[in-house]
C-alpha cells in the first residue's frame, strides 16, 4: 500500500485520467473529490462489499429453483429418459 500525506487542495493522480483532490479535513473526516472517466465505477468500500455480497447471493441458484423456472416455461418437456 502506498501511503501519502496531502494537504487541503493538494491532489493525487492515478494513471493518466484519475485525479483525487483533498477538499476538506475536519477532525477524523477527510472529504475528497474524485475526477475519473464515466466508465470507472467509484464506490465507498461498504457499498462495494454490500454489492459484492448481493451478487454472490444472486448467483447461488439451487437446482430446485432452476427446475421451478423450467416448469413455468411452456416449452419444458421434463427430464429426458436417459437421465
UniProtKB/Swiss-Prot annotation:
Annotated GO CC locations: cytosol
Family that this chain belongs to: Belongs to the CsrA/RsmA family.
Upper classification of the organism: Bacteria, Thermotogati, Thermotogota, Thermotogae, Thermotogales
Ranges in a coiled coil: none
A GO molecular-function annotation: mRNA 5'-UTR binding
One Pfam family this sequence matches: CsrA
Domain of life of the source: Bacteria
Keywords of the record: Bacterial flagellum biogenesis, Cytoplasm, Repressor, RNA-binding, Translation regulation
Protein's cellular compartments: Cytoplasm
Annotated protein name in UniProt: Translational regulator CsrA
Gene Ontology process terms (BP): bacterial-type flagellum organization; mRNA catabolic process; negative regulation of translational initiation; regulation of bacterial-type flagellum assembly; regulation of carbohydrate metabolic process
InterPro entries for the chain: CsrA, CsrA_sf
